[in-house]
């Protein structure tokens, strides 16, 4: 029996050779592989396959998956494939072909009476986003991020304190304990960074032992060469990451001074272009160092006609500056440069900038990491054309490069890629399901640890789930002890060994960071280009390996107003 390709796609979703448009962008992906056996596809519903004795077998709960996502189109750094995805005990158990092994061939995921089904036909499945630049200013950020498809948040803060409004720092053991206890209340994987700005090791060590998964160096606390060297030394000893916001004013040295202070040790440079902060005008040079793991924050993503004007006001508020003081205004203006922001677009497209994050409420929007990543990809395709690695008529490599920026690469950087960051067997089942027309903008379903934590949902008093008003609502994995079973709190190995979870009475699952200090840029997937960067100190023009980097600002973006009328 044969059916048309269109009929097949309508019934089971696209298969090999079919192309899917991502939202209203000009990005097209093509299915590279389909794990199904044609004619043996499983689908749930009245008169469908997953019924007793048909696609559902007689095996006990221990032998079948807890949850099955059927016929989903996976976009991940490793491929763009169609598959069934099985989840067991909160982790991804299998990616392959589901069904009843008693009567169906090639089954790699057994379905039984203990199996729940989520229909993935015609849907896109991605790993939950990993945002590694969080100012924990208000707890409401967490729900906002979750509803956008982010499932892991790393950063620092204590609430709307002036220090937190400017820096991603949870300072000292007392604040660290309070924030770890607070994190038990949220369906989100969370890790906190301590204050790295001190020139002796003791105050840093006590923060790591209290639970910090990393240390943050920020110019507002004094990012001197001595503080940098001390912080990296402690990080090397305790296997935690260091994130840095460098010295915009060049008071304690220039970009060359800071790079020398790194002494070839691994470090995550925040907003490496510089609008978010850093040596003016040439912190962007850092992305050419093999030990530097560079990221952007989302307000400069992508470069548009409004980017410059918006940034000046943002900066004055976030860094406690006074518009009546000439030096404060000069400080702000030194950070906002059209030329370096334009270059940032291109450096992302070349894979020289490896990650993208939010800078939540502190010159960044916590719910727009994913959207702005794909807006940047779309702008670059329109302005630069297909990448050399892309296949004919598709943007598969570009899609893999850009999705890696907010999933696997930040997870690798912060030592949590053994738990999250990709759709791979054994990892925590933090998964996001999207309708292609809403991809990157509004997810349909967000799973945490294999359970549904958030979803689009209609009127709770309606006779079916879909009547308006349809909006995002927390689901059962966001409540009670289910929340604790399906989300992770990340801490250092030193804190784990010291019994911090027990002493603080933490209830969520505990993840331990590891491998932070051996990561090099070459380890960041699809984003490991090491250009030789030059910045003209007068014109701010940027060159990479001798090539001028300039692109025009966008007047119109996809994934924007047409999606937010309601």
Curated annotation (Swiss-Prot):
Keywords: Cytoplasm, Hydrolase, Metal-binding, Nickel. SUPFAM superfamilies: Composite domain of metallo-dependent hydrolases, Metallo-dependent hydrolases. Its main location: cytoplasm. Its cofactor is Ni cation. Substrate binds at residue 218. NCBIfam families: PRK13206.1, PRK13207.1, urease_alph. This is Urease subunit alpha 2.
């Amino acid at each position: 029996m044969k059916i048309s390709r269109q009929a097949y796609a309508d019934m089971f979703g696209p298969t090999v050779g079919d192309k899917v448009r991502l939202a209203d962008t000009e990005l097209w992906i093509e299915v590279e592989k389909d794990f199904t056996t044609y004619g043996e596809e499983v689908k749930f519903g009245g008169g469908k396959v997953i019924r007793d004795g048909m696609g559902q077998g007689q095996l006990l709960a221990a032998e079948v998956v807890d949850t099955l996502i059927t016929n989903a189109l996976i976009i991940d750094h490793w491929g763009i494939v169609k598959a069934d995805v099985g989840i067991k005990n909160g982790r991804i158990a299998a990616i392959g072909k589901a069904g009843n092994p008693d009567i169906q061939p090639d089954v790699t995921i057994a379905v039984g009476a203990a199996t729940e089904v989520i229909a993935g036909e015609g849907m896109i499945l991605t790993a939950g986003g990993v945002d590694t630049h969080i100012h924990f200013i208000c707890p409401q950020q967490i729900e906002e991020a979750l509803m956008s498809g982010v499932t892991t948040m790393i950063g620092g803060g204590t609430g709307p304190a002036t220090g937190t409004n400017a820096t991603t720092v949870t300072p000292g053991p007392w604040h660290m304990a309070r924030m770890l206890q607070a994190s038990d209340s949220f369906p989100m994987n969370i890790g906190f960074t301590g204050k790295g700005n001190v020139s002796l090791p003791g105050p840093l060590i006590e923060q790591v032992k209290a639970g910090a998964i990393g240390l943050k160096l920020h110019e507002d606390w004094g990012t001197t060469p001595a503080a940098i060297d001390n912080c990296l030394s402690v990080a090397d000893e305790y296997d935690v990451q260091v994130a840095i916001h460098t010295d915009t004013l060049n008071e304690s040295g220039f970009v060359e001074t800071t790079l020398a202070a790194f002494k070839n040790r691994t470090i995550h440079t925040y907003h490496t272009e510089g609008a978010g902060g850093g040596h003016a005008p040439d912190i962007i040079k850092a992305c050419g160092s093999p030990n530097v793991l560079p990221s952007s924050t989302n307000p400069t993503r992508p470069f548009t006609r409004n980017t410059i004007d918006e940034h000046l006001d943002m900066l004055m508020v976030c860094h406690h500056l006074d518009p009546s003081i000439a030096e404060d205004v000069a400080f702000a203006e030194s950070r906002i440069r059209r030329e370096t922001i334009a270059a940032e677009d291109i450096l992302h497209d070349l894979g020289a900038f490896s990650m993208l994050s939010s800078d939540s409420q502190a010159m960044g929007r916590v719910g727009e990491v994913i959207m702005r990543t794909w807006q940047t990809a779309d702008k670059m395709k329109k302005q630069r054309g297909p990448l050399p690695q892309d296949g004919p008529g598709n943007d598969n490599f570009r899609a893999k490069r850009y999705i890696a920026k907010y999933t696997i690469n930040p997870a690798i950087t912060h030592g949590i890629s053994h738990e999250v960051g990709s759709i791979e067997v054994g990892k925590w089942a933090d998964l996001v399901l999207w309708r292609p027309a809403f991809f990157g903008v509004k997810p349909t379903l967000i799973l945490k640890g294999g359970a549904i934590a958030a979803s689009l949902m209609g009127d709770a008093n309606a006779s079916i789930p879909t009547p308006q008003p349809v909006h995002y609502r927390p689901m059962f994995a966001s409540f009670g002890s289910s929340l604790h079973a399906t989300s992770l709190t990340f801490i250092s190995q030193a804190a784990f060994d010291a019994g911090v979870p027990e002493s603080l009475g933490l209830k969520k699952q505990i993840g331990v960071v590891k491998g932070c200090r051996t990561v090099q840029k070459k380890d960041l997937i699809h984003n490991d280009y090491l250009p030789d960067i030059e910045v003209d100190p007068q014109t701010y023009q940027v060159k990479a390996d001798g090539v001028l980097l300039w692109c025009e600002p966008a007047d119109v973006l996809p994934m924007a107003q047409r999606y937010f009328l309601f």
